[in-house]
Amino acid sequence: MMDWFMSTVYFYGPEINVSNRVVRNFSSDIENFLRISFVDEDCEKLRATDLSPRSASGHDANRTALYKRVLSVLSDGITIGGKNFEFLAFSSSQLRDNSAWMFASRQGLAASDIRTWMGDFRNIRNVAKYAARLGQSFSSSTETLKVQKYEVEEISDIKNGTQHVFSDGIGKISSAFANEVAMKCNLKRFAPSAFQIRYGGYKGVVAVDPTSRWKLSLRKSMLKFQSDNITVDVLAYSKYQPGFLNRQLITLLSTLGVRDSVFEQKQEEAVNQLNKMVTDPQAAIEAIELMPMGEITNAVKELLLCGYQPDDEPYLSMLLQTFRASKLLELKTKSRILIPKGRAMMGCLDETRTLKYGQVFIRATSGVNDNDRFTVTGKVVIAKNPCLHPGDIRILHAVDVPVLHHMFNCVVFPQQGPRPHPNECSGSDLDGDIYFVSWDPSLIPPRMVTPMDYTPAPTETLDHDVTIEEVEEYFTNYIVNESLGMIANAHVVFADKEDLKAESSPCIELAKLFSIAVDFPKTGVPALIPPELHVKEYPDFMEKLDKVTYESKGVIGKLYREIKKHTPHIKHFTREVARRSYDTDMIVDGYEDYITEAMALKDEYDFKLGNLMDHYGIKSEAEIISGCILKMAKNFTKKSDADAIRLAVRSLRKEARSRFSEMSLDDNGHGHDASEAKASAWYHVTYHPEFWGCYNEGYERPHFISFPWCIYEKLLRIKQRRKFVRKMQPELFSLHNLRI
């Protein structure tokens, strides 16, 4: 990976990343792949004005030297260590981040050969769409199973006599095959109701159909290009996801009549829960459902169930305090308020044709335990982020449909009516979009307005095959014309200042421009912001310290100033904390025999963990371990790099467990069962005051304590046995007295 600055190039070593179809297939050439990002001198995304003045009319004469430099890097490639890396392609998320894949051609394999392997794109005569289809194979995914073409059913799209495609982006999967795919995704407890997939040139969602005998049933709206690839790659799947409000949702709901006091109460309830979780075990267990799911979540839950108090054990305490701090930060910067009677759900289609227009089916789980299911009935509010137009908020009626009970943790829309409900929500479809759904009566607005028309602008069709040079130029022009952030920020400001809020004329115009900007990667048609919609002063909650600001009188301003009163508090593992918290229950006979090895392994673990933290610019051990990152280096983002960080930490912990298993084996690979003594040694060299600070000499790093919890099952087994012995001692003593 490398960052290309205006005047400098920074190189980064290999990173653990979520894989994609292309890299998996050409894994033997992994050293020939390169990710390049174009950033400014502050490691932030290039702005449109860096490449073209705001007054530019689109002619080459108005492009800056930087524009030509970016284009030349893409067209001429970049040479590193004797290898010339040439442009390959970019995914949709990479395009938004001004990033792309490059490849160093070798004898027998060039970048053009990889693109040919990906599929046949010759019938696509629009540059933006062509680039998007190239990027389809670079979506981060999990490889599952191969499906032969004869095992795939082609089914018709559903238009219902309208110009709209109600089934846009969605097909079906049999129950049996869904179970097989779930196993390949390491989902042993349950099979999801829907998977977001890539299969050959198909993209979209497949939802479980218990009546189907075909492995896959796919529609024309899902086919984007021809490809010989027959592997099902999974990008995401339906699952329990808590529902959160954000500034856009709050703005629209407020515009439609939801009172400010409702949002203030919801925020207060969320803060109270966060405050309780750092002292109350039950509140902490409930809050765990909101943490990024994974091995760390399980460890935290097991620690609590074992009887550890949230504010007592340092490792547990720092994870919970960091989680609280990250949620407070989200409340302050995004107004991200938890809604218990709400979920974030993947959209699906009612294949039974039971639901009427205005109805939805919602069957949810109470938490990650998928067996605890319930069906929602009554009025619900539904939206899809991002949402700027008041008509993006839909009030629908949730009904119970027994024949759809197999569909859970997803929102099922009808295939009937004048227009698909997903399209009414920000112009969405069913190819993997996630919808905010709430059945909280206090959040149901008293009125609903007509949704906006999201028909995309007509696209330019070329009279020739798209060339890779045109794709490179399109990438550079995207940086010039990318205006989503500017439009969204302007909408926030005008909605805050105008009496009609999001229904004001400036906001309606900005919503239309935003729709054009969202479609730009597919259409190539830019959104041009008129001068009167440029922002001159910002509300205080946007924290634009270098701009003219004012105190917001709106609901977002009220929420912001209230949440500023709450400050995060994360305790550090000082020598005094080590003296106070060292748990003698963890001492097991024979642990001394493994001290030397344990110290060496902890030293190695801490060194690698510290390097990861330095690489990503993460300040605390708890942040990188929990995934609740408060701040990181400017050249990384929580949204784009969270998976890479999670995988890197998981790999480090897995390596530590592997080294634990190898400890003290003889030359033949045999060893006696002394796992508890080894685990005790790991705990001792981490927690005992004698060892405090001895691993970070020469480094400006605090004392790390996550090392022994890589084997938390072993430590908890020791703790549970000690608790059991203490519990039994009075009974044994009484029995002894009776015998006397």
UniProtKB/Swiss-Prot annotation:
Which InterPro entries does the record match to this protein? RNA-dep_RNA_pol_euk-typ (IPR007855)
- Molecular function in Gene Ontology: RNA binding; RNA-directed RNA polymerase activity
Q: Main EC class of this protein?
A: transferase
- Please name the GO terms of the biological process aspect recorded for this protein, alphabetically: positive regulation of post-transcriptional gene silencing; response to salicylic acid; response to virus; siRNA processing; wax biosynthetic process
Which UniProt key words apply to this protein? Nucleotidyltransferase, RNA-binding, RNA-directed RNA polymerase, RNA-mediated gene silencing, Transferase
An annotated GO cellular component of this protein is:
nuclear RNA-directed RNA polymerase complex
Please give the catalytic activity noted in the UniProt record.
RNA(n) + a ribonucleoside 5'-triphosphate = RNA(n+1) + diphosphate
Q: What is its EC number?
A: 2.7.7.48
Record family assignment: Belongs to the RdRP family.
Its function, per the record, reads: Probably involved in the RNA silencing pathway and required for the generation of small interfering RNAs (siRNAs).
What is this protein's name?
Answer: Probable RNA-dependent RNA polymerase 1
